[in-house]
Every structure is written in structure tokens, then in C-alpha cells.
Amino acid sequence: MRQRSGIRHRWWIGLACLGCVLHHTDAAAQGPSGGPLTLNDAIQLALRNYPAIKESRARAQAAEEGVGVARTAYLPRLDMMWQENRATTNNVFGLLFPQSTLFSMTGPVLGTRSLGDSVWGSAGAVLLSWEAVDFGQRKAGVDVARAQTSLAKNQSALTELDVASAAADAFLTVLAADESVRAARANVDRLQVFSNNVRTLVQNQLRPGADQSRAEAELAVANNQLSQAVQIAEVARASLADAVGAAGASFELTAGALTAVPEFTIEPADLTTHPAARAGQAAIDVVRARERTLDRAYYPHITLQSTFAARGSGAETPGVSSFGNGLWVQVPNWAVGASVTFPALDLFSINARKRVEAQNEVAESAHYDRTIQALTTQEVKARALMKAATEIARNTPAERQAATAGENQARARYQSGLATVVEVAEAHRLLAQAEADDAVARLGVWRALLATAQAHGDLAPFLDRIKP
């Protein structure tokens, strides 16, 4: 009885998990508004979910936080130290160059050499230092951080443009693939009817058996073409799911305004405002900001300092009263002053770094010129694509009408014995191609508009045309 109850319990858990999976799948198959996915929904999903968008935005935010890091150089520095030690008191006169290995001794020479006698020592200090005058070095560092922030933001804008364009193009590709599937399925239906008619005529010995074989072969070819069209549509949907950042999800699409051929006028664009061009210019600005930092590097540093310190020692000096066991500080001191430091020999390294940055500026300027050239070429190609797509969209209705009339006439002539099955098959093939061309031609114009908007660096005019 317990075993049967456990089995029933596992069944309920399995059904609950299956329901959660199905609910998640249904939710993923819907657009943000809960209905079929529109092109604008696809773009918004991509901008919200695609990993590259999150990465670029995070990098831009990190660069912006870097400005705050650079500004902290204006703050004073406060160092605190406390020390407890036990050591011998042997000391000698003499000089030691500054180094980090041998510890220093303070106090008079006692003339002792014993390693067995040791005392406690303590020390504490607070040092406040502030660079009062830097001749613009810290400001130059902040300017570098701001230039890097501008570069990161422009790169993020370019990423958003690329991701949104890819999502829109994938959406149009799915619509075109679905239209091709409809045309292929209509062709299969027509050829199925024609094949049945030919079979009846052959069975009644009104047509030779070769006609039936040809009709069945044409039907098989049409079915294969339908399978290929379905495959292309499924692959296109997978690409759309990836483009919107929901890989593996399935969406129901609605064409909306994309079913009609749009009316448009293409205005000339300033390619220097394209996100790619702005990112290239920002990269040049970063190099120039680093060059200005190097211009300020060969200047002195004027630092104000103040300190309070105290020490204690268990060592006894002849003629001086004892300060206790040395575990606590007993002798205080304070000091206030200013120091000037000047990196005299840094001139050589600074000049070498300037030569490096000069070549970096040449490289970034060349990259900017290449970007402008690529954008110009992209715009010219988009205009050519627009011209061809518009002409094709004007011609396909006539193509479809003529192909439909030709197919009707070929079937009628075949029924009357005035045409061969080859003529009918060719008419069917021509009609199928005409239907596919007509269905895809409208989307071709929209795709050309998308390519033009992407070349101009702004999808807003394209999205305004698809609003209901």
C-alpha cells in the first residue's frame, strides 16, 4: 500500500514538473505583451536579453565608475602605523644606503655586542599627506577616465544597433521563410489535384502512362521543396530565438504593417553620427587624453605633510631616566612640512611613451577613416538594394497574375488534349516561383529599409514606419 502511494506521489510530482515546463514554453512563445511577437517586440527582447548588450552596458558602467576612481587622487592620504617589537640594543656609528633588508637602529652607541640582552619597543604614528600642487596631472588623469567612458558608451550604442538590427533581420527572415512555405504548400496542393486528374485520365486510357509518371514525379519534387522550405523556416526561427536572447524558444509572429509595401523617402545622412564613427572618434580622444597626461608628467610634485608619532623603549641610556618596559609609547613628537619631488631623469621614459602614443593616434585615426569608408560603402549598397527591391516589388504582382493565367490555360489545354504534361508541369513550377517572389518581394523592401537605417546608424525611422 505504501509502495502504491509512493508511486502515485511520484506521478503527481512528474505531472507538476511537466506543467511547469509547458507553462515556461508557452510563456517563451509569446511576446512581451502576451500576444504574438511583433518586430518591435523582437527588438525590445533582444535589447533586454541578449548577453552582448548586458556585457557592453556593464563595461560602460565600469568605465563611468573609473571617473570616480580617478577623482579620488584629489583626496589626502592618511596612513596609520602601530608596532611592537623585542630586540637587542647593540648599535654602531656609520652610514647605510636606503634599503629594505637591514633594519635601522636609533639611539647612542652603548658599546655592547651581546645577543642575549633584549628589550621591548613600541611605536605609533599617523601621517597625513596631500598633494597640494600637481600642475594639472590629476585633472589629466580624470580626463583620460572620461574619454574612456565616452568610448565605452559609444561602443555600447554600436552593440545595441548591431543586436537590434540582427533581431529585426531575423524577424523578417522568418516572415519570408513562412511565405515561402505557404507558396510551396499551395504548389503541392495544386500538383496533388493535377496528379489525381492525370491518374483518372490514364486509368480511362485517355492519356499515356508516362503522363501519370511525370505528374507523380512533379508532385514528389514539390513535396521535397516543401520539406526544404519548412526546414529553412525552422532554422530561421531558431536564429530569431538566438537573436532575441531566448535561444531554444518558439515564437508566434505577426507581420502587422509589414504586409504592405511601404512608401518612403531616404534622406541623406551624416555618417559621422553613426555609433561606429563616434566610437572611432572616442578612441582617438582617449589617445589624445593620454598624450595630455604625458605632457603634464614632467612637473614637480608639491606635497603637504603632517605627522604625529610616539615611541617607547625598554632600553636604558646612561644619564637618562628609564621610560618603563617599552610596551607602550612614552615619547611623542609631531611635525608639519612640505616636500617637493621632481622626477629629473623621467624625461627619457616620458618622451618614449609620447612617441608610442603618437603612433597610437595615427593608428586610431586610420581606423576611423576605414570606418567612415566602410559606412559609406554600406550606405551605397543599401541604396542599391533599396532600388532593386522596389522594382521587384512593382513587378511581382504582374508576374504572379501572368503565371496564374498561364497555369489555368495549360491545365485547360491539357484537359482538351492540346498540351502535354510537360507544359502543365512547367506552368505549375512558374506559378510556384511567382507566388514565392510576390510574397517575399514586399519583405525585401522592408529589409532594404532596415539595411538603410542600419547604415545610417539609427533604426528609429524604420521603426516609425511599422507602427500601427
Per-range role (PLM):
Residues 205, 245, 417, 456-457:
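Short helix-capping/hinge motifs at transmembrane helix termini and TM-loop junctions
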Residues 2-14:
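Bacterial N-terminal signal peptides that target proteins for export
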Residues 36-38, 77-158, 278-290, 297-371, ...:
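Small/polar-residue-enriched beta-strand and adjacent coil segments characteristic
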Residues 73-75, 163, 208, 298:
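Short, glycine-/polar-rich solvent-exposed loops and beta-turns at beta-strand/coil boundaries
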Residues 28-84, 89-92, 131-132, 248, ...:
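Bacterial Sec-pathway N-terminal export signals of envelope proteins
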Residues 12-23:
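Bacterial N-terminal signal peptides
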Residues 2, 159-273, 385, 389, ...:
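Periplasmic alpha-helical coiled-coil/stalk elements that build and connect Gram-negative outer-membrane
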Residues 55-70, 159, 163-182, 193, ...:
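Amphipathic alpha-helical coiled-coil segments
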